[in-house]
Structures are given as structure tokens and as C-alpha cells.
Amino acid sequence: MQNSALKAWLDSSYLSGANQSWIEQLYEDFLTDPDSVDANWRSTFQQLPGTGVKPDQFHSQTREYFRRLAKDASRYSSTISDPDTNVKQVKVLQLINAYRFRGHQHANLDPLGLWQQDKVADLDPSFHDLTEADFQETFNVGSFASGKETMKLGELLEALKQTYCGPIGAEYMHITSTEEKRWIQQRIESGRATFNSEEKKRFLSELTAAEGLERYLGAKFPGAKRFSLEGGDALIPMLKEMIRHAGNSGTREVVLGMAHRGRLNVLVNVLGKKPQDLFDEFAGKHKEHLGTGDVKYHMGFSSDFQTDGGLVHLALAFNPSHLEIVSPVVIGSVRARLDRLDEPSSNKVLPITIHGDAAVTGQGVVQETLNMSKARGYEVGGTVRIVINNQVGFTTSNPLDARSTPYCTDIGKMVQAPIFHVNADDPEAVAFVTRLALDFRNTFKRDVFIDLVCYRRHGHNEADEPSATQPLMYQKIKKHPTPRKIYADKLEQEKVATLEDATEMVNLYRDALDAGDCVVAEWRPMNMHSFTWSPYLNHEWDEEYPNKVEMKRLQELAKRISTVPEAVEMQSRVAKIYGDRQAMAAGEKLFDWGGAENLAYATLVDEGIPVRLSGEDSGRGTFFHRHAVIHNQSNGSTYTPLQHIHNGQGAFRVWDSVLSEEAVLAFEYGYATAEPRTLTIWEAQFGDFANGAQVVIDQFISSGEQKWGRMCGLVMLLPHGYEGQGPEHSSARLERYLQLCAEQNMQVCVPSTPAQVYHMLRRQALRGMRRPLVVMSPKSLLRHPLAVSSLEELANGTFLPAIGEIDELDPKGVKRVVMCSGKVYYDLLEQRRKNNQHDVAIVRIEQLYPFPHKAMQEVLQQFAHVKDFVWCQEEPLNQGAWYCSQHHFREVIPFGASLRYAGRPASASPAVGYMSVHQKQQQDLVNDALNVE
């Protein structure tokens, strides 16, 4: 420390003496992460003189060295008295730290040897003024976890290289937590795990299976797409080792998400799918009742896997070709399972997501998902993230084209996840890293990355020719032995297994494939989880369901959720809202939207049905209407009345989400597909922003049941309505959802009264059918004086897919019927009343899909004589329901009647940006709909 900039400053500062140790610790934190210290201290440390001063060593290591040295009387005089030795000791500790920080840059990670990183100067002893003459000198090793307090420099250097520059490259010094860093150091510096002969033979057998399946498929179905794992074969022993280790650590469920690369191999060699079933899929055979189906490398699978610690249930999530989107779906599924156990931080459920090197750094949903990893409503106790890093994305292999970071896994540093790079040609290193990563996740409940550095033996798919764009890489690959061959040769040299043993493994596996039965010894038939979905099969949208709540109980619930303890100091406007709700409960006021919605949740949790509501502002509601969560104005605490109904109630969980649409909606889809007993709701801040999650809507929500047989009762609340707020705050793009509707795949509703939203939400939870519900929820109607409902309408009513004329018009005098949905109804109603018109009836369609033909025919029955029908909408002609639903409108109006459009003209933008233009357009469309010539 004689040359330390910090020491020079302390010697000339009044901040010394008793404060010196504290300041040294603060400076050590600054060296690790400048942002971790207060801005004033950071500014002070940054101003320390740098000229002629070598990089500072962590002072705790130096202090520890001298502390140990002082206790060693036999060496005290000879060591302490030599100032040169003291300086070199500090340099040795600097060298150790350099390997911890940057040793991974010299690690032997690339099986092909093509990936050459720049030399790191501070890994060379000479950088620290240490020469070969010092190699035989003995130095204290500080906190280096070798099991020794002192080592010769040459021995220490070799240990550092083996630890940090071998087939494993560890990145963890970016982590702020000292405890986590020391835990990792202890595990990796204390020596690699040793494996017995049986374990090594098992690794060889699993590599044999990985290679054997790919070769078998290549021979049996030449040219067919299978997205081979070859080159990354170590994924199979990695996954099986992780499942075994997880089972021994108390895990009872593992949920996997992965893309196409190696998926068929995982299905057969990990989850135990019968090879014959896979062969049938290659041959084009399929079961007729499974809907449209999907390609084989998108299909999911479930099974049980026997470990020494007990059975582990495995679930591989279904996924589309859209890379990385399955990751938040998996996390949502895991959170649902943990909530079912009521153990949100339990190790009983393990999420494993498998990524590609190009996709993990290229797809923004990865960042969104990582950002959720420690958020209260979304955390799952950490995810093990495996990157199959075959160093090429389709045809892009130059890192300068693929990313802007040295490693594809650098994104993991945003959540301070440790990153373990490992050479996929070394299955023992892979197994060591697998156990290490899982133990870290289980210990610290954090995400962890494994970068499985490998290669892709064939093209992106088997019909592709990769040498056109990667000539040098594929010249090397053609000459490179397979991972199985490399490891078989190694075990022969170790006299663990002969080449004859290895050949026998190959033959036995091929025979097992010929037989077509399960090839996974640990596979067991599923004996749990199968009950979950049976009550929800074979239901229709319009079937009867138990909907009634006794008036007395409804009043009790309304009173309970509007009563707040005196200790909770409410904000004045919130107090006014809760006062109004007490009046609603007493029958003194009609229910507004927020009151009816909250009461719907209360009735459900009262019956033991859990409710999960999430969105960017869901606790309060974007438009200040819900206030399910009350914020105490005196101390900042929160109170949720819906969580205080009675002890045996269903859980009510409301979460203000991270600012994301894509990952959060995918998470909620995963949650809903894993837990049908919960009413799962995602609310967009504005419906306009939901298209940030369009891939989730297109690939999962609208089509998941037809492609994969996956039912989902997710509710999407999308605030929608034209109120002059411009093109980004007016439209939830109703037309896009209607365009996706077919085969009764989902429901699209536009409720217009508090009673309707009350019954709609209850119907979604109580009815047996589990299909997505897309709701064009209101904004201005939340406080509209006409958009109110009585307690009797809540108690005795039901959801009406169509609502007829409410004013007392003489049907015989009606010349025109205007059909509409949503807020525009009230504009039409008020204008008609203002005009004192009696010749125009207004009919609301509250459910646009599945279209309520029967209900509409009943509503229109009294207008059978009318020949003039109008569809009125706020949206432009090319948007809204007109184009997608007019064939339904025509089907329910009387034969021979005409149908005309009243609404905004076609527009490239959803809405105008000028209030005056908006108001004129709105008045024009209302007048157009009502004016009878």
C-alpha cells in the first residue's frame, strides 16, 4: 500500500485515524463499483492522483495478509522487515484479483479454437512487476480459496489458470453482493468436482444418446428439418444432471422453455417422448381431434423423472418460432405453480430457459423478462438460463454484426447474474457448472446464466448449406471429432471405459430407437397434475353457469370492501370514492364502474376463487377508478380491502407491473395456462399500447388452443374509446382482435355498464370454458352519469351479449335501428333524447365474438318491419368492427333490410390529434347515425 493513491490522500487528510478503516472499505467498494458509493465520496475518490500510481489492490486482502503475517512469529522478522517483499505481496494479491475479474477472457471455451480474444495484460505476472525469479517465492494467497494460506507464486499462477482459464470461464465480479461473490469464489477456487466412474459412463451414455438420435433421424428422414443439436450435444447431460441435482435439492417440478435448436433431442432423451411418436410426426401422421396442430419442433411435453430425491414433474412449454418469447411464458407458468403452493420463493419449482446466442442478445423480450426477475409480482426464486452458444445465428457469425458486447450473455449483468461460460466438448466441466449454477440459484434466489459454448455441425436447418457464409468455420467443423468421440477417447485413456464399451452404447441406443419405446431410464408415467384441466374440457361459451349471489351477501361484501381501518389515512379523493362505495353498498347510490368491478372480485374470492390482476397501474387504475390498493398517507403502507374478506377466502393479488407489455402479457398467459382456477387479468395502461405485445396475442392467446390444445382463461382489459386524446390514446385496435377470431378461439366483449362488467368477470371465472377474454374497457364511462347500475342488477342479472332499446319507444314507430358497441352508445342516446327522437332505436352488441346471433335476433324481433339498419362506430371505416363483423350484422337483421355504416372515414391513423377536429367528427358520426331522411 506504500504506493497507494488512497494512502497518499489519507496521509494528508483530516479523515484518518479512527475513520481510516471505514474509508478504506468505502474505497474498496468504489474500486469494485463506483456507482455503489455516495456521489460525494465517488467524486472525492475520482480526484485522487493517478500519475505514477499502480492500480489499487483491495485493502481488505492486504489487511488480511498482514494480520496473518503478524501471527506467524517464525516468519515475522524475515518477512516484515523486507519492504520489497511487502510490495510484491500486494502485487500477488493484485494478480489474484486480475484473474477473478478477467481470467475468463483467456479461458479455453471454443471447441473449434476459432474464437480468439485479445490478450489481457494484467493476467501476466510481469504486469504486476513479478518475474520468474519470484515463482519459487512463497506468498500469502489472501482469500484465494485453495485450502492453503500460502503458496509459491508458480504454484499459485498454475492454480489461477486452472480455475479461471480452463474449460470454464467465470464472470461474477460485477456482482455487488460480497456474500454472493465469496460463495462463488469458494466453490470454483476450491477445485473442480471429481466424478466417479459410474458418473463418467453416464455422461458418455447421454452424449451417445444425443448424437445417436440426430444421426438416426438424419438417416431415416434425410433433408427433413430437425434443427439438430449436433455440436451442442452436451445440452442433454447438462439438463439431466440439472434435473437430478434439482430433485436431490427438493425440487418437484421443472418447467423448461426452449426454441427449436435441439428440441427434438430434449423431447426424446430428457422428457422421454417415445421415438416412434416422433417418427410418426416426421411421416406426417397426426390425430384428427387436435385442431390445426403445429410443427414437431414447437410441441410441448410433460412427464415424470425419477431422481434419488424423488419424482420430478417435467413440463416443456409449447412455443412458436418467435425466438425468446417463450421465456416469460415459462416464468409465468412457474409463478402460478408457486402461488398454488403458496410458496413464492420455494425451490420446489425450477424454471429453466434455453436460449440461442444470437437471440438472447438480440431480442428485447429477454431484457424485459430479466427486469421482472426480482419484481414482487413476477419473481420465481431465480431462473437457470442456458445459452446454446453455437457462435452463429442462421448465417450471421461475426460478433460485430450480432451484438455490441464481448459476450452474448452480457445482458445477464443487468440483474447481476453470475455467468459461467463452459466448453461444450468437456462434459465434466459442463456437469460441474450445472451443479454450481443450480446451487447458486437455490441459495440466492437469483437468475444465473450458463454459456454453453459449442458449434452447429449442420446448417440452420438440415436443408441449408452453411459453408456458403461460414467457409472457415465449416472446414474446421468437418475435421472436428464429435463430443461423444472426444469423451470416449478420454475415458479410454483413463481406463474408465474401453472403445468397445463406447461402441456397445451406440449399438444399444440404436436398437432402442428401432424399438420405438421410451429411451430415458428415469422416465416414469405421470401420477400427478393430470387432474387440473379435466373440469374445463368440452364447454361452450353460452352454457348456463351458477351466477347468483344473494342480495344480503352482496351487500355485506360491498360494505366490507368499502370499509377501511381508521389507522389507514386515505388521500382525500380516494376517501371520497370509498365514501361513495359505502353509499352504494347501502343502496343509497347506484354502482359506478369501479364499485361494480371490485364487487365482482369480492364475490369470487369470497367463493374461494383466486384473482390475479396485473398491469402498469392496476392497483389504482390508470384512470383513478379502481383503488383496489389504498396507500396510507401517513406512513406509505398499503391496504387492500379485497384481501380482508374472511380467513378462508381465495387469494386476491394485484400487482403494478414493470413497464412492459410483451413480457408481462406473455407471463400472464403462462400463468393462466398453468392455473385455470384463478381469474387471471392483464390490464393495459391504454389499449393502444397492447400492440407492443402483438407476438403474444398472435402466437399464443389467439391460436394456442388450436395449435397445441392449450386452454387459457386470460382476461385482457384494454382501455378503448375516442375522447380526443390523439392517435396513441384512443384505440385498442379492436379490428385486429376480431380479425383473429375463428373457431370460437376467444371472446371479444365491449361492456357498457357496471352490471355488465360485473357479470362478465364472474362469467369468465365461474363458467367451465377457459378461453381468452379480450375486453374493450372504457375510460370516460368510468364516471359517466348514465353508466351506472343498481345493486338489484348485480344480484339478479346476468351478462347480456346484446342489449335492446332501453327507452319506451313504440316499436311500430321506429324507422331505423342503430347498432353499436361501447361508449358511442351514450353519445347516441344523449343526442337522441336531446333531439326528442322516437323513430330511431339503439341496440348494443356487448359481445362481438363469438357473435350472439340468438340474442340479437331476440332483441331485433320487435323491429322486424324496419328496413333501415345502421352500424355506428367511433373508429375509422377501415378499423373497428365494421369490416370484420358486418357479415354477422347482416345475418341478424330482417331479410331485405339495408345495412349502412356511420362512423369516421377511413384513416391511416387511429384518431386525429386535434380536439376540435375530434369533436366535429364525433358529432358528425352521431348525426349521421340518427338522422332519418
Curated annotation (Swiss-Prot):
| Cofactor(s), names only, from the UniProt record | thiamine diphosphate
Residues found modified as O-AMP-threonine: T405
Question: What SUPFAM superfamilies has UniProt attached to this entry?
Answer: Thiamin diphosphate-binding fold (THDP-binding)
Per the record, its GO cellular-component terms are: cytoplasm; cytosol; oxoglutarate dehydrogenase complex
Give the record's keywords alphabetically: Nucleotide-binding, Oxidoreductase, Phosphoprotein, Thiamine pyrophosphate, Tricarboxylic acid cycle
GO BP field: tricarboxylic acid cycle
Enzyme Commission number(s) of this protein = 1.2.4.2
Outcome after substituting R710A: Mild reduction in growth in presence of acetate or glucose as sole source of carbon
Q: Does the keyword Isomerase apply?
A: no
Q: What class of enzyme is it?
A: oxidoreductase
Matching SMART domains: Transket_pyr
Per its record, the protein catalyses: N(6)-[(R)-lipoyl]-L-lysyl-[protein] + 2-oxoglutarate + H(+) = N(6)-[(R)-S(8)-succinyldihydrolipoyl]-L-lysyl-[protein] + CO2
Q: What's the family?
A: Belongs to the alpha-ketoglutarate dehydrogenase family.
The protein's role, per its UniProt record: E1 component of the 2-oxoglutarate dehydrogenase (OGDH) complex which catalyzes the decarboxylation of 2-oxoglutarate, the first step in the conversion of 2-oxoglutarate to succinyl-CoA and CO(2).
Recite the other comments. Binds AMP; however it is not clear if the binding is physiologically relevant.
User: PANTHER family recorded for this chain?
Assistant: 2-OXOADIPATE DEHYDROGENASE COMPLEX COMPONENT E1, 2-OXOGLUTARATE DEHYDROGENASE
Subunit comment: Homodimer. Part of the 2-oxoglutarate dehydrogenase (OGDH) complex composed of E1 (2-oxoglutarate dehydrogenase), E2 (dihydrolipoamide succinyltransferase) and E3 (dihydrolipoamide dehydrogenase); the complex contains multiple copies of the three enzymatic components (E1, E2 and E3). Interacts (via N-terminus) with SucB, the E2 component of OGDH complex.
Q: What is this protein called?
A: 2-oxoglutarate dehydrogenase E1 component
Gene name as annotated = sucA
